[in-house]
Amino acid sequence: MKLVKFFSLSLIVLLTLVSCGGGETPVPFNVYFDGDIIEDKATITVNTVDEILSEMPFYFFIENESDNSFSVNITEKRNYDLTKFESNLCISQCLPGNGEETQVWTVDNLPSGFSQKIDYHLSPVDPSTPAKGEVLFTVSNGDYSTSFTVIFDFPGIN
């Protein structure tokens, strides 16, 4: 009877260790904005009064924290009047938005330990018109994803 209790107790302890995994699963990548890690579901507000460029530059970094290289998809979901703004996203080159509400971009083979700068530009079609809106970014490598919202406020140029 003592032997059965010993094996039962040992099995419970073993299952507990296996289910807990001995710690958290390491995050394969982090997204940084202004030097800080962007938490999942974060909201970032961007205000601009740049009268020379009349656009809203916004950039973030994706850093590979894993031991392997992998590709990352960036989904841009726009929530604003698509006739008032033009956007482009720059990874290794700048690619204009396709006029759709949602677009997916790919960073191919991000090496282990490296980071990739992502530039996003939003330009008003008519710089004198004030406008507000938001863009939801989702970054995913297929197994792990994080998302954040960028809210922008363009006051217009007089």
Regions found by a protein language model. Give the residues of each.
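Bacterial N-terminal signal peptides that target proteins for export
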Residues: 1-8
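C-terminal motif of bacterial Sec signal peptides marking the signal peptidase cleavage site
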Residues: 16-19
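Beta-sheet-dominated interaction scaffolds and their linkers
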Residues: 23-69
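Short solvent-exposed strand-capping/beta-turn motif centered on an Asx-Ser/Thr pair
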Residues: 63-69, 79, 125-127, 142
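Short acidic/proline- and small/hydrophobic-mixed sequence motifs that coincide with surface turns
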Residues: 65-72, 146, 154
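Surface-exposed binding patches on compact interaction domains or structured appendages
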Residues: 67-115
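Short, hydrophobic beta-strand segments
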Residues: 114-126
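Terminal connector regions
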Residues: 126-156
